[in-house]
């Protein structure tokens, strides 16, 4: 994700065995019988199910006064319960769609239900109340798991247990008007199957003595003890799906809710992880400071617990797979130095270093992010979208050849590169299903799209939570819309941390499983280029790492740390030069300043959530100031030129070759 201006976002409001292992778990949510077979590349066919789709509008919750304690808890409780219910209901088929975030939900609902859409022939049933919704889907849950607000982490435990045991999460609340009392004490009550507090109402997790139900001494933190209990009783015992985790804010949100817009609690994101029986967690990553939500814990307790969770998950699959973690550091609320008029997140580390540190820890355990960063991090209905029937392959525009480069005027009549500066726009950041779901409609409806080459960095693993969006974009591409993998492939991790020594885990190399994870997704989405490899503060790619990328990303990589360009085993590579921001004129000026070095001729510039109209204005401003001396091309053409440049006879006589091999 790598957001140098992260606060601006808020202001805008395997081997075959590995693949079979993933498929076994994936069948919880997408059995083979529901997958439509492709009629041809990029097209699917299938028979619509006769089961109706239920639509429930939950947007009434945003009318509540969150400044009122009771209404704030209602907002949390109902959002939490409905997200869990949706995950259970949609586990094997798309049955329930929640209207939660009006603009994106209405847009994608409209796309699915319009003539010719995925749901065009499906019966739609609108349910008007929460009670009616629970009654309709009573067969999908066995009871309730009750959690303890005094230990906010138990909200995430409840979500995890809900997915594993087919339960609904309920916050214990003795007040008569609470959701708990309404569902537990009323006629036809939902039975309580698991209690995360004692029968007498005392805390189950106290941070003293032994961790309940184990012989393990307490960590001294009720928060950490709760997660360590979960690891022992659900992760190590095989109840959870080791291939999916979710890093989402726990119920501490009830204290710090003013830090960001209400939907940034990201409860609506939990449905997918619950559907897949994954683990939900919220833990800090720094061992040199205590977290704002647990200031009395000893230093390092949160990150030690996180590493314990990741190691237990890694051990479940014997290291033979990539663990995918939806969500992101809740930086506006916890674990960073973020400060707003209403809240201080309590840390000393800025957002980007915290992101990088978290990425390093994940990477050392073969885990990657689907990085739902706050500001645009909320996403509803991923458990529904996951059932969208994808084709086996989505071809994109034909990759450039020497003949194509010549036709574009990039090679002269002698086959040499025309001497000028070549620039490509890396259009990010789409390493998050939530960001794609929120931003894609505006980007794809921009009237300037298609006028200049843009290289869209849609991570291919987003097809697991938002296949509809990826397919929709591909089906509406222009000849100037190019697609590359974003940070750092089929998921955001630091690939340098896949090679030993892996300082946070000491585990053997994960490069082979990373390659096996990426390859089928690259093939499905016709990707042969990785537009950004984020190394953060971690180690650079080793020779083995470069070789792995050469296998599944043979048309090139763009790296964050590397300050040179070259070709490795036939794979060209370049450094990412700079992030473009500000007005188009300011961005054009930055390009002019960055490209003054006469020894370099190929440049990649990154933008974050910038529209096609903005990029067009930047390109026009560059042309006005530089004329034909700077040429904007797509990333595939740019890196093909780098490969051509490796051949002495194809380089202009005026250029000095300075590549590393």
Named regions from a protein language model:
Residues 2-18:
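Bacterial N-terminal signal peptides that target proteins for export
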Residues 15-27:
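Bacterial N-terminal signal peptides
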Residues 29-31, 35-38:
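Boundary at the C-terminal end of the N-terminal hydrophobic targeting segment
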Residues 37-392:
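Preference for solvent-exposed, low-hydrophobicity sequence contexts
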Residues 147-150, 327-330, 420-421, 425-430, ...:
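Short loop/turn segments at strand-loop or loop-helix junctions that form parts
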Residues 302-330, 423, 427-437, 441, ...:
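Catalytic grooves of carbohydrate-active enzymes
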Residues 387-474:
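Active-site beta->alpha N-cap acidic-glycine motif
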Residues 459-520, 524-527:
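Substrate-binding cleft of extracellular glycoside hydrolase catalytic domains
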